[in-house]
Amino acid sequence: MLGDHGSGYWIGRKALRAAAADLDRRGPSTTITRGVVEALGLPRGCTVQGLIGKTKELRPADVASFAQIVLSAQDDKIASIILAAGASELVTTVRSVGAEHVILAGGLLAPSTSHKYQRPNTLRAMVEDSLGGCTYASHPVVGACWAAGRLRGVELHKVDLMNALEVRSDSRRR
């Protein structure tokens, strides 16, 4: 992968590295470790070798799923460092494009009520505070259509776009 800094995969990889460093006693203790160990189905008191063995099987989407552990542990010092770095990376990416208005999409930036752990979304708050003027779209396609309409001076409603997207995807399943 060439980029995707601050993404779920990026944060998930940082979580795995933090857990490995904790288990190996090369890094600080973090509550992320417990979440990673449980998610991988490893026994308590496992070794870093056990963790490494399990991570060899992981697909990118599996790695990205560990980002939720970091979001749920945002009071943990290491988790807050990872989230701050992720937010900084996302902001840097957006600023490099020079966009006037940003549409956030994706699970990590979803409102906190849609997260498994029901915690305030610190990552999203950090990104919004740095950029200002952000809009959230529940699906990237909705955000892209909304932005395209805005560029052309056409007002599109995100809810209508999302409903159209759902209808279209349902018809393909039949």
Residue ranges and their predicted role:
Residues 10-13, 84, 92, 142, ...:
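A broad detector of short, well-ordered amphipathic alpha-helices
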Residues 34-46, 92-93, 163-174:
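Short, mixed-charge aromatic SLiMs
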Residues 114, 122-174:
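Glycine-rich phosphate-binding/hydrolytic loop that grips phosphoryl groups
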Residues 1-42:
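Glycine-rich phosphate-binding loop plus the immediately following alpha-helix
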Residues 47-100, 137:
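Adenine-nucleotide phosphate-binding core of ATP-dependent small-molecule kinases
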Residues 13-21, 72, 146-150:
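Short glycine/serine- and small hydrophobic-enriched flexible loop segments
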Residues 83, 95-127:
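Glycine-rich phosphate-binding loops at beta-strand->alpha-helix junctions
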Residues 7-12, 62, 66, 123, ...:
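Catalytic-loop motifs flanking and including active-site residues across diverse enzymes
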